[in-house]
Structure formats: C-alpha cells, structure tokens
C-alpha cells in the first residue's frame, strides 16, 4: 500500500487530530444519542483505526509500519513503546517536532530536497534513524534558510518536546535522548496496534 496523498481533512474527520498529517482540526458531525448507541464498533475496527492513526500521522506505508513492528518485537522492552520510539526518531519526524516544518509531509520534502543536515552532513533519507547527540541543522543556502525561517515563524507556538532542544537563532536542533512515552505528540493506544499486527509480525 502506497503513501496516502488524498484529502487530509477526510482522514482527521474519521480518526481525529493527527498533527503530523495536518495542522487543521476536524469538525465532527453531530449525531443523536440513539444513533451512537445503535452503532457498535468491533474490536477489529478499533485496532484498525489505531493502526491507521500511526500510519497517517507519520506518513508511512503499510509495509514500512509492519517492518517497524517486526523490529520492535525483536528489541528489548515493551513492543509498543519501542515502536513509537522508532517512529519518533525518524529524521522527518524530528525535523517536524523541532518546528522546522509545519507537518511531517513538509519535513519529508525538506529532507528529500537536501535542505537538512545531520552532524554537518546532508541526509536526504526521511526514514534515517536519529540517535542521541545528533545535531540537526539547515544547509547554509539562502533558499534553505528562508524556508526554515518561514516554517519556524509558523510553528513557534508548538512546544519542542523534552528529548529535543532547538536554537531558533542558529536554526539548530539537538537530539538529547531517546524520548519517553509522555513526549509522544499523538493520542494513541500503541498496544492495540501491536495486537492488530500480532498474526503478521
């Protein structure tokens, strides 16, 4: 299954707020109490929707998400928490969480177009896995600097999570540590995602 490129509002209307996909908030349709009571949601659908939240928020394909689940299963610790850490430490997500891009698709475009440096080296792979003490900077070109400055001004209200620091004057970010569960920028039940893939991973 390829990466989603359709209307983003339709997705958040179904799954709720997904800050990585879009900064818009969904306008939910009002339903009568009788309609809500009559609509029983299956356990499969609940797990499926949690999985879809992860996939659309981080902008990854079904195959990529399944691979991350398989890696998380082999690692020490809680599979769900390791899965979230793997996704959060992707370069495109780090660029987004630092406020250098308004969304993860926007961050992925910056990385693909070679605007972003990791430890002073250009990295154009959005899935690149960042690690503690990595520094994230912008290419010293007028176009690159202008894009990031505009994005920072747009995203300045967003709080940088505890595992990252960002110097807006130097346009430099730093990965301090692997993030903890509380720093995840998404309302998600990762255990349901692991359960969804229990027969596939």
Curated annotation (Swiss-Prot):
Entry's InterPro entries? Ribosomal_uS4, Ribosomal_uS4_bac-type, Ribosomal_uS4_CS, Ribosomal_uS4_N, S4_RNA-bd, S4_RNA-bd_sf
> Per its record, what are the GO molecular function terms?
rRNA binding; structural constituent of ribosome
Sequence ranges assigned to domain S4 RNA-binding in this UniProt record: 89-150
The entry's keywords: Chloroplast, Plastid, Ribonucleoprotein, Ribosomal protein, RNA-binding, rRNA-binding
GO CC term, one of those recorded:
chloroplast
A GO BP term here is: ribosomal small subunit biogenesis
Give the protein's biological function. One of the primary rRNA binding proteins, it binds directly to 16S rRNA where it nucleates assembly of the body of the 30S subunit.
Under the heading HAMAP family, the entry gives: Ribosomal_uS4_B
Name of this chain's protein: Small ribosomal subunit protein uS4c
Q: What species is this protein from?
A: Funaria hygrometrica
């Amino acid at each position: 299954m390829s990466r989603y490129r359709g209307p983003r509002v339709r997705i958040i209307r179904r799954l709720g707020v997904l800050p990585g996909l879009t900064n818009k908030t969904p306008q939910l349709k009002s339903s009568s109490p009788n309609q809500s009571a009559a609509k029983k949601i299956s356990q499969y659908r609940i797990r499926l929707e949690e999985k879809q939240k992860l996939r659309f928020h981080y902008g990854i394909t079904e195959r990529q998400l399944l691979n991350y689940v398989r890696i998380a299963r082999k690692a020490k610790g809680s599979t769900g928490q390791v899965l979230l850490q793997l996704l959060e430490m992707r370069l495109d997500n780090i660029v987004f969480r630092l406020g250098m891009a308004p969304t993860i698709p926007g961050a992925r475009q910056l990385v693909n177009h070679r605007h972003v440096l990791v430890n002073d080296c250009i990295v154009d792979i959005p899935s690149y896995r960042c690690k503690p003490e990595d520094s994230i900077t912008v290419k010293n070109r007028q176009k690159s600097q202008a894009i990031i400055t505009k994005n920072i001004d747009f995203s300045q209200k967003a709080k940088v999570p505890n595992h990252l620091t960002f110097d807006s004057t130097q346009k430099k970010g730093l990965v301090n540590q692997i993030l903890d569960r509380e720093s995840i920028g998404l309302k998600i039940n990762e255990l349901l995602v692991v359960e969804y893939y229990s027969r596939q991973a």
